């Protein structure tokens, strides 16, 4: 039971990344986490701020892009099973970087770690943008003058939220925040119910006729945003390792992906029916602020990222502290300094690129598609040895990998183009 509690205290967005020179030692093959708790953790890992962007993704690609959502869900589910197979082939594997190391040596570990850390960094940055957007909607026409510098609306709120979050990043003990961040499971349900309530009972309705069946020029954005919704694969090795009965892991994945896909599809359809092509990159920005259900949705959206921010950046800080341990031998001082520098850089990026939808599209295309689709396929091909013999599954894996590469190239190009187009 104590081991299960220790597991509950770990960040579920991603397991802490070991130093690339570390060996696979001190392995305990017996986990203590039950089936139901693993389902809970899996749903929490899959559910996140992506739920706010799925209506925008649907509006970008049209109604037929729902097929893309289900295709992405099925593909990423299959890639989760590939991760499980890799873990089964070598019981010493405990984390995603370990799988990369097993497949491609230190190069594989470094590549996986870079993708994981960069994804965490940009998602944490998107939290600040999200907070700034929604607080600016609630409290418009608010500004701040500091030492002759004018900070208006969104800029001021981004800085203010960063100052509120910073003390939580300084903490070494993340147990309390880990429990709070688990509210992501309930937050997704609350947001879905609130959006439905706004449409059904508070005057917005579901009869917006400004919608399209298919928009070819928006497909790249749709795929990227949908991919971002399923970017939890770095945590799946941790979930697998923690399970008491690892044979049930596939069933856990079925439940997690089914529930989250239902929620994502429901929010996408409701949001598109309510606002059509006018839907914002965050559905909460469309909601009327004078309605109770809207306030519940917006405040739920605001609280959850604040709790999760520290958990997102802690693995990055730990990796930086390990890298600079000789220069900064004092653990507490180095943690304080590095975490402050990291959060400051998050704020700078958020102020320079304050475009939530475009940033999520970039993360989904470049990082999520790579970490959740391409890397699982390549690692499984190498570890299983299937790359040496041509069969049906090998062809499927090659096809998925090539498709993933196309998504990375086209989605990243479109996201970067959209970002620069806003300046």
Swiss-Prot record:
Bilayer topology: Multi-pass membrane protein
Pfam families the record matches: Aa_trans (PF01490)
Official protein name in the record: Amino acid transporter AVT1J
Stated family: Belongs to the amino acid/polyamine transporter 2 family. Amino acid/auxin permease (AAAP) (TC 2.A.18.5) subfamily.
Top-level division of the source organism's lineage: Eukaryota
Compartments where located: Membrane
Organism of this sequence: Arabidopsis thaliana (Mouse-ear cress)
Bilayer-crossing regions: 39-59, 63-83, 110-130, 151-171, 186-206, 219-239, 252-272, 297-317, 333-355, 359-381, 390-410
Keyword entries, A-Z: Amino-acid transport, Membrane, Transmembrane, Transmembrane helix, Transport
InterPro entries: AA_transpt_TM
One GO BP annotation of this record: amino acid transport
Gene Ontology cellular-component terms listed: organelle membrane
Lineage: Eukaryota, Viridiplantae, Streptophyta, Embryophyta, Tracheophyta
Coiled coil: none
């Amino acid at each position: 039971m104590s081991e299960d509690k220790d597991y509950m205290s770990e960040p579920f967005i991603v397991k802490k990344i070991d130093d690339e020179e570390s060996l696979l030692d001190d392995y305990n093959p017996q986990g203590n986490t039950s089936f139901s708790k693993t389902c809970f953790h899996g749903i929490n890992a899959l559910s996140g701020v992506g739920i706010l962007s799925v209506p925008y993704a649907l509006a970008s690609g049209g109604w037929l892009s729902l097929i893309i959502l289900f295709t992405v869900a099925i593909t990423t589910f299959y890639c989760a099973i590939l991760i499980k197979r890799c873990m089964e082939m070598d019981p010493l594997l405990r984390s995603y970087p370990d799988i990369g190391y097993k497949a491609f040596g230190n190069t594989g570990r470094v590549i996986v770690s870079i993708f994981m850390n960069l994804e965490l960094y940009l998602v944490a940055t998107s939290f600040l943008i999200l907070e700034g957007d929604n607080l600016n909607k609630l409290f418009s026409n608010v500004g701040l003058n500091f030492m002759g510098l004018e900070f208006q609306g969104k800029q001021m709120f981004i800085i203010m939220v960063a100052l509120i979050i910073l003390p939580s990043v300084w903490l070494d003990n993340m147990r309390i925040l880990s429990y709070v961040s688990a509210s992501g499971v309930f937050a997704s349900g609350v947001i879905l119910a609130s959006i439905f309530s706004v449409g059904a009972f508070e005057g917005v309705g579901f009869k917006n006729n400004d919608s399209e069946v298919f928009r070819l020029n928006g497909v790249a954005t749709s795929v990227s945003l949908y991919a971002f919704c399923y970017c939890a694969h770095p945590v799946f090795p941790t979930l697998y390792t923690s399970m008491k009965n690892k044979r049930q892991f596939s069933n856990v994945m079925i439940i997690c992906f089914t529930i989250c896909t239902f929620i994502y599809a429901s929010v996408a359809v409701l949001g598109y029916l309510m606002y059509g092509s006018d839907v914002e990159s965050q559905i909460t920005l469309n909601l009327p602020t004078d309605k109770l259900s809207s306030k519940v949705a917006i405040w739920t959206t605001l609280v959850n990222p604040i709790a999760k921010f520290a958990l997102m950046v802690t693995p990055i800080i730990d990796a930086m502290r390990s890298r600079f341990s000789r220069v900064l031998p004092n653990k507490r001082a180095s943690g304080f300094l590095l975490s402050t520098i990291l959060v400051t850089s998050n704020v700078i990026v958020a102020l320079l690129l304050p475009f939530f939808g475009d940033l999520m599209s970039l993360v989904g295309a470049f990082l999520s598609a790579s970490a959740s689709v391409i890397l699982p396929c390549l690692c499984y091909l190498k570890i299983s040895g299937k790359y040496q013999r041509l069969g049906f599954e090998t062809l499927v894996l090659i096809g998925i990998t090539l498709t993933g590469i196309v998504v990375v190239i086209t989605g990243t190009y479109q996201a970067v183009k959209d970002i620069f187009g806003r300046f």
